[in-house]
Amino acid sequence: DGLQFPDLYFFQPKKIFLLKGNTVEIQYLNMCDDEVESDFEEITQSQKLNVKSQKLPINIQQRISKENYLKKTEKMLAHIHRGDIYEANFCMEFFAEDANIEPVEIYEKLNEISASPFAVYFKKNQHYLLSASPERYLKKEDEKVISQPIKGTAKRNLNIELDEQSKMDLQNNPKERSENIMIVDLVRNDLSHTATKGSVEVEELCEIYTFKQVHQMISTIVSNVEHTTSPIEILRTTFPMGSMTGAPKISAMQIIEELEETKRGLYSGAVGYFTPTGNFDFNVVIRSILYNSENKYLS
């Protein structure tokens, strides 16, 4: 693990700047609420940070050769044919050593290319996450819990007719639909652990959402929970998200642990927040760059 990210990290922010459309909502803890005006003045008078990194070449390497990857894929298929699992999300790492990047600049470029609803720029000491994730893992709004797994991707096309055809092909692709529905069943089971009786429901099945670069097949599964149900318990009984493991979840995870070359770390994990009222919203960490600025390791 060249990144050396912590497995788990939470913090309580003293100061929050919450962007809502064209407005900014500022929330400070009582211990520092007397700093609001001075902070606001400093921000409004500051110049835009002009970050320009040196264009040094980065040598991206693959963690496993194509030949060995295909051999491991055959082993994965053997598990499927034997009935151990129905599907699995088999990942490999692409990485660079001695990489010098400017994280802010890279993040801005990444999200110019692929504007995503669950994008994240996160820094903890020397650790950076630059994410263009389109996927929600789990959200809680009062008594309602929402999961939106993604399975199924199709490239956009500049030609309107071809773009629409790409969308329709994805909608009707039996392989993509089958994979999506398997994960829907898994999520329904996960949510049932904390749901009130009979409340688990599929609101959207294999719907096509259009993003800047791709069309995605997304399903929406919801449940209701008692107001006394712990948010931690809801996360504990659903994590990790099925879209990044496969089904059945535990069997898929055991096989992934055996066949993948490196630990995933924060990749295929989640970033999100809790509110003081017990609500939360977490994404899926995919389509992301992870970077350790101390040892210059990029993944």
Feature names for model-found ranges:
Residues 1-299:
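Extended alpha-helical targeting/anchoring segments
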